[in-house]
Regions:
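Eukaryotic serine/threonine protein kinase catalytic domain
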Residues: 1-243
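Regulatory extensions appended to serine/threonine kinase catalytic cores
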Residues: 243-267
Length: 267
């Protein structure tokens, strides 16, 4: 944590030792994260302000977000539907923005969804992300097993957006239910549950939430709902802030709207 001398804004400083990068073979991951964070500008994606290279380290100066959705759920348990929907709206619109810029995140989970002081989502950790080319398919198995789509754990080809939809479905389930839909201490058993889509929907969920989860956690990626279709659902649009409604935004307009919603920015 640091403070920008001219603006007084708090920033996060991430220092990565070059020797550690080399020894752990994570150079590609660091380069991808820097590449995508430089490219993406959205109110609910963590901002990268500066990258400084020294002889020994790579220093990333990032927007400060002191919390994370994972800890918030641990502290609060299952969330009221209205609160879960607010987080979900921010996650989905940020993910949709990534997809429009041909970026598949591939590691969406509560631990990678940071929270600022006003409880706004900031999607982070783009180290496993990848660029999607038209007609191209990915095969790399990425992400955390509990949040990974069936086609990912099976090693099948996938285009990208559909695996993020599955992960967002798991995240929504966790927010609404306070537990994972697919969980097992024995990884092979976990993979069977995921590959067969074996999970239950608690009775306390609204019919609309059940329908949405059922359309996101579909084993066949071709039949899985898409993010543009999610954004058309009445449930998704309840109390949707104007700045998240789907229309083209330039970075300058985004930043202005960002200020209006009390999220910290840095000139």
């Amino acid at each position: 944590l640091a403070t920008h001398a001219l603006t007084g804004h708090r920033v996060a400083v991430k220092i990565i030792n070059k020797h550690k990068i080399s020894s752990m073979d994570i150079g590609g991951r660091i380069k991808r994260e820097i590449q995508f964070l430089r490219m993406l500008r959205h109110p609910h994606i963590i901002k990268l302000y500066e990258v400084i290279a020294t002889p020994s380290d790579i220093i990333m100066v990032l927007e400060y977000a002191g919390g994370e959705l994972f800890q918030y759920i641990v502290d609060h348990g299952r969330l009221p539907e209205s609160e879960a929907r607010r987080f979900f709206q921010q996650i989905i619109t940020a993910t949709n923005y990534c997809h429009k810029h041909k970026v598949a995140h591939r590691d969406l989970k509560p631990e990678n969804l940071l929270l600022d002081e006003f409880l706004n989502i900031k999607v982070g950790d783009f180290g496993l992300s990848n660029l999607m080319g038209d007609g191209d398919f990915l095969k790399t198995s990425c992400g955390s097993p509990n949040y990974a789509a069936p086609e990912v754990i099976a090693g099948r080809l996938y285009s990208g957006p559909e695996v993020d939809v599955w992960s967002c479905g798991v995240i929504l389930y966790v927010m609404l239910c306070g537990r994972l839909p697919f969980d097992d201490d024995y990884v092979p058993s976990l993979f069977v549950k995921i590959s067969k889509g074996i999970y239950s929907l608690p009775s306390h969920l609204s019919p609309e939430a059940k329908d949405l989860l059922s359309s996101m956690l579909v084993v066949d990626p071709v039949k899985r709902i898409t993010i543009p279709d999610i954004m058309q659902l009445p449930w998704f649009n309840v109390d949707l802030p104007a700045y998240l409604r789907p229309y083209p935004l330039t970075p300058s307009v985004e930043d202005k709207q960002f200020v209006l919603h009390r999220a910290p920015v840095m000139d």
